[in-house]
């Protein structure tokens, strides 16, 4: 033991932790009960970790008490203690786990927490529930001894800018033989949490299904267990109520919302395993964090192994719950999990069952399915791109905003096909509102064709592959040639409007090509425009313009030159034919056709200053200036 180890060290919190603590110390949240749920959950995790490590090193458990959690109120001292005899922490682990938040997205999380009405739910989702204790305590002392170690450490903070860490006193060291003890010095307005009935109420509401016994140690009387400590997923569905499932979901997911879908079953056969999975009804703030993985916990015969086993594909990462295997070896390493043949089969079977359950929910309970789709539809669509085996099912599950203004399934869209329509049409962009006014819709709108309006970033990816639904190809209105001539227009009088073009096709295209030079790959007469002058489209063989835009923003490829389509019936295009080839007016009008198409596509002209000067020049000419 060195002198420096013996001394009391004061260390600052990580900046984001200080900000988080400030929110907790000055909390305006009313649901302060969460602190006990979070501390009990952390204690349970510590017991899980010890049980897992003891598979390889049985001596860590020793001959002592069974793994458990104790809650000890002390009205005389005004303290509430939550203690476990789990894995415990060394000095550096106390610093790392309680002084920093070692994961990406921390700044975004703290910012979101400031804005969120359900901030407490975010705390549990992000895995920083320990800090919620500062809502009710003005001082916290943590005493911990790691399993198999002799040193005992004490961590103390009042929720300010830092914390103290030192060797524990002899008295504390004698009391904490293994695990962690958290002593909360409660604020005056939080003394209700010293009442045994309050503690029992909170444990019953949030922690009843914790797998380890939770003992309440009153100041008078004998300790007693206050939770059922049963693996709810191992029980029969007939024994469980909707309220049981709700409590289990909220405990497993550290959530406050109700589950929108519950899947509970037992698989028997070649492999035996129990499954209890939930789909939340609200979206977690970090759903699209690159580091976010699935949150399904793997157990083997009720022993927690890991929550990092990738039990479901990435597009189902919003699902929470438990898979408990009867056949996997208890001592399976986390490294072996990825390629274990049993687990490969379990992953495949569980993913198929989840998708099947979503299909059933979509048919039988449209309201709850809508909650799932609104929160997680963008994630589910990743599966259309990633999971060829289930692509057709995921397409059937998908709900798309269309030009009808409603969210519709592809089955509904196909059922309402117009005469002679053979393809499902779509447009990809960055917002529904901008897509609604996109000029590429004009020919389809004139025929009453329903078009999918796709505005999630993932839409640019899954639509980049040849895709069809029930034999009907999906066709982009912004890529390749378009021929809608066989589909009659809604208003027959519209047919008369396309009789005489304002411009001679070959001559006009040649003039515009000459004016634009290398800015575009080609100039074509448009079959998709009825009232706008021009639009940009991508070649049928390459990536869409939307995918190009996303990839270029990530520095992942050059953008191809677009095809400029012109409306030969538009007066502006007709004016180009009438003007003298090579004149300034022809150059200005041709460039303006390109630049306004870029603007309508959500892009800036290549040279905004030149565009403004050109526009001013043409306006003044029109005014006779």
UniProtKB/Swiss-Prot annotation:
Keywords: ATP-binding, Chaperone, Cytoplasm, Nucleotide-binding, Stress response. Gene3D superfamilies: 3.30.230.80, 3.40.50.11260, Heat shock protein 90, C-terminal domain (1.20.120.790), Histidine kinase-like ATPase, C-terminal domain (3.30.565.10). It is found in: Cytoplasm. SUPFAM superfamilies: ATPase domain of HSP90 chaperone/DNA topoisomerase II/histidine kinase, HSP90 C-terminal domain, Ribosomal protein S5 domain 2-like. The keyword Chaperone applies. InterPro entries: HATPase_C_sf, HSP90_C, Hsp90_fam, Hsp90_N, Ribosomal_Su5_D2-typ_SF. Residues 1-334 are annotated as: A. GO terms for cellular component: cytosol. It comes from the Bacteria. One of its GO terms (molecular function) is unfolded protein binding. It holds the Pfam family HATPase_c_3. Residues 335-549 are annotated as: B. CDD domains: HATPase_Hsp90-like. Belongs to the heat shock protein 90 family. Homodimer. This is Chaperone protein HtpG.
